[in-house]
Amino acid sequence: MFENITAAPADPILGLADLFRADDRPGKINLGIGVYKDETGKTPVLTSVKKAEQYLLENETTKNYLGIDGIPEFARCTQELLFGKGSALINDKRARTAQTPGGTGALRIAADFLAKNTPVKRVWVSNPSWPNHKSVFNAAGLEVREYAYYDAENHTLDFEALQASLSEAQAGDVVLFHGCCHNPTGIDPTLEQWQVLAELSVEKGWLPLFDFAYQGFARGLEEDAEGLRAFAALHKELIVASSYSKNFGLYNERVGACTLVAADAETVDRAFSQMKSAIRANYSNPPAHGASIVATILSNDALRAIWEQELTDMRQRIQRMRQLFVNTLQEKGANRDFSFIIKQNGMFSFSGLTKDQVLRLREEFGVYAVASGRVNVAGMTPDNMAPLCEAIVAVL
């Protein structure tokens, strides 16, 4: 039965990590997978996380199963981070949150819930977007359509083309937005543009689905939620898939959340019971450790202050690397202007490198980037910057 199965193609991002591990060149540089690295090239465990783990180690009393939707305190903290403390939406009990295995788990639960319980058939995703979006929605039986996003010539958001392509989206379609730090371009709508999209979305009858994986990495925790909150102020219904992989550095703990918002408490409770049913048929209930860390930090003022400072430090380091990257490319004689990279948000930069140039970087210089030209700025350090920029200039 199994002998006729053909091999699946390598994942465009995780497959790159396998190639990187197998490369024995000493100066190799990994700008592929989206993990934060410090000045020494390590992905550290945050001090706030270590302290929370110490607390849990000493105070945890059981390893019993969690409920289907996870830790209640985690859900409460998640909603406050997304919608703001004292938000009317929270006070009116219009939101319910399920703890999920990472942001990917949240997206899949949202997709399964929609496919089974609503007339939704189509999900609109930006072009370009995170490659796994299409796989997740297709796996749940939903059709994926693309809307225009990026102006490659000017390295900006093509807002007119975005609106024009979304004019084809019908009432009852899901439109996926990146909450901030758009992956892979690093280009986000302005607050005014978010406002326009929120109004358009209500007018057209779309269901907004926010993929929110980088809160705190663009401008700050509150600022990065402005787009989502503009939608939440106008929409009766929306879904948020959020992740704590990046902003808490909890990549391998798989900590995510799927938050459902409806018109009133009774409706959201009824709908959420079906979301829990989708979870039960998938992984039954989530693991406790990562979400316990998040809930411990967010509900303790001292730990939260440490975490917020660490998040600020990570964000500022990435911004410094953007500036250094642009300056070093110029110093090394790059024959094109890369200053647009400074304006992008989050870990990634859409470099404008072609697939062939990316391949040459890997084969000739041991520099690993995604075929789309997306590079992880958080993988750059003062030590690897010169050889990296020399390699890029050589393939331009």
From Swiss-Prot:
It comes from Salmonella typhimurium (strain LT2 / SGSC1412 / ATCC 700720). The lineage of its organism: Bacteria, Pseudomonadati, Pseudomonadota, Gammaproteobacteria, Enterobacterales. It is found in: Cytoplasm. Disulfide bonds: none annotated. One of its GO terms (cellular component) is cytosol. It catalyses: L-aspartate + 2-oxoglutarate = oxaloacetate + L-glutamate. Its EC number is 2.6.1.1. One of its GO terms (molecular function) is pyridoxal phosphate binding. This is Aspartate aminotransferase. The modification N6-(pyridoxal phosphate)lysine is found at residue 246. Homodimer. GO terms for biological process: L-phenylalanine biosynthetic process from chorismate via phenylpyruvate. Its main location: cytoplasm. Keywords: Aminotransferase, Cytoplasm, Pyridoxal phosphate, Transferase. It holds the Pfam family Aminotran_1_2. L-aspartate binds at residues 34, 130, 183, 374. Belongs to the class-I pyridoxal-phosphate-dependent aminotransferase family. It comes from the Bacteria. Its cofactor is pyridoxal 5'-phosphate.
